Amino acid sequence: MQMDSAQNQFNKRARLFEDPELKDAKVIYPSNPESTEPVNKGYGGSTAIQSFFKESKAEETPKVLKKRGRKKKNPNPEEVNSSTPGGDDSENRSKFYESASARKRTVTAEERERAVNAAKTFEPTNPYFRVVLRPSYLYRGCIMYLPSGFAEKYLSGISGFIKLQLGEKQWPVRCLYKAGRAKFSQGWYEFTLENNIGEGDVCVFELLRTRDFVLEVTAFRVNEYV
């Protein structure tokens, strides 16, 4: 009887290791070489079998840190195309060329001479200077250079906005003095445009005040002497 019981137990163990589902199982030996107790205790409460079916801990996947930042917004088509002909820049540009072409005249020598002679008859009591408006003063960057003699005497150290007065209205114009020369830049174009001052006209600039620095302008237009 004892032999039969041992044989049955052996057959059970043999079937266990012949099970196809456990064909990849490996026998685990104790990690301590001095230990003589086998880790595999067999079927039913066997630590070996339990180790095969023991739920393994899932490997932790490393967390990928996302870079924080603002998402790029899709550009507004209307904002992207703000420089198209419908935009303000294009409209201002077209106005500039229209006004420039309108003020660009075919001036004869006789007409120019008449305007210059008329300006010479006007002699203010305050310091003044005369300028015949050239195309470069009106169209190419809209910068006008002042006579060096007047600039050295009255504009030395000026670097900022002064006022040009024509009639009852004043316009701020940037004046820059450097190395004996002075020029009008920002605001000069608006002044000539609003007062319809064009090529060949003669302007007389009279110094009214040095504290706020106001220059009164008297314009002698060539079309008045045609």
Swiss-Prot record:
This is B3 domain-containing protein REM19. Coiled coil: none annotated. It is found in: Nucleus. PANTHER family: B3 DOMAIN-CONTAINING PROTEIN OS01G0723500 (PTHR31391:SF106), B3 DOMAIN-CONTAINING PROTEIN OS11G0197600-RELATED (PTHR31391). Its main location: nucleus. Ubiquitous. Involved in the regulation of vernalization. Binds to DNA in vitro in a non-sequence-specific manner. XLG2 promotes the DNA binding activity of RTV1 specifically to promoter regions of FT and SOC1 in vivo and thus leads to the activation of floral integrator genes. Residues 1-11 have a biased composition (Polar residues). Keywords: DNA-binding, Nucleus, Transcription, Transcription regulation. Residues 64-74 have a biased composition (Basic residues). GO terms for cellular component: nucleus; plasma membrane. GO terms for molecular function: DNA binding. The keyword DNA-binding applies. One of its GO terms (biological process) is response to cold. Induction: By cold. Interacts with XLG2. Interacts with ITN1. InterPro entries: B3_DNA-bd, DNA-bd_pseudobarrel_sf, REM16-like. Residues 1-93 are annotated as: Disordered. Residues 15-26, 54-63 have a biased composition (Basic and acidic residues). Residues 129-223 bind DNA. A motif (Nuclear localization signal) lies at residues 70-73.
